[in-house]
Amino acid sequence: MLLEAIGSGARRVRGLPPRDPRQAKFVTGASLRWMWRNRAFSPWYLMRFWRLFWLRVLHPDVVTEGMVFIGRRVELYARTGYARLILGRWVHVGAENRLRAHEGTLRVGDKAVFGRDNTINCYLDVEIGAATIMADWVYVCDFDHVYDDIHVPIKDQGIVKSPVRIGPDCWVGTKVTVLRGSTIGHGCVLAAHAVVRGDVPPMSVVGGVPGRVLKDRVEVYEAKAATRAALEDIARKTARAAASSGG
């Protein structure tokens, strides 16, 4: 309750809009019971509670829909009046990540995990699905700089934007780059160092520069069905033989 009171007071002083209804309340009976049940009193937990407290006080435009675990030197930025950064429940953000919503909306689904040193830049719309894993040094952006006019500095020619969607249950490997206009289906694996742009079907494994589909996870799983069945049969027979000899 102290957190909500301080946050509300800060919003009144700054003249900001009312509190977003999606903002979770952390000091509740349920949250205290969770802390007790999980023995969440270690220095690791206490430091993350402290970081979350100051995030809510100093950055009210960052919406946290539930408990969020924040590592060291993390940058969570949403430009007031222009952008919104929404973090789902149980999101883990490792050390030195940078999630920047300059304009538009940057949404992170429940239980997404960020390794370290990842950068997400949003100027229109970026969505990272629930339970998606981002490794280290991943870069995601939904814009490009315009460079058509050779007589005008590139920095003065503006940008072009297209939304980025990374579906749930994806694994984005080390040093992957996801460019504007990309839609990554659920359950995809983006191999290390891949540069991805465009549509990627669900359950695909993508690698290379530019990124291309290397295999279909469903096809691989079904192709190994006979092997799995044979191994299960061996395990059953072994267990049956052991039970018979023991009797």
Predicted features, each with a name:
Residues 1-141, 167-169, 202, 211-215, ...:
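Domain-scale signature associated with acetyltransferase and cell-envelope carbohydrate enzymes
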Residues 153-164:
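A short acidic, glycine-rich active-site loop
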Residues 140-149:
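Proline-centered turn/helix-capping motifs that create local helix->coil transitions or kinks
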Residues 161, 167, 173:
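A conserved catalytic-core signature of glycosyltransferases
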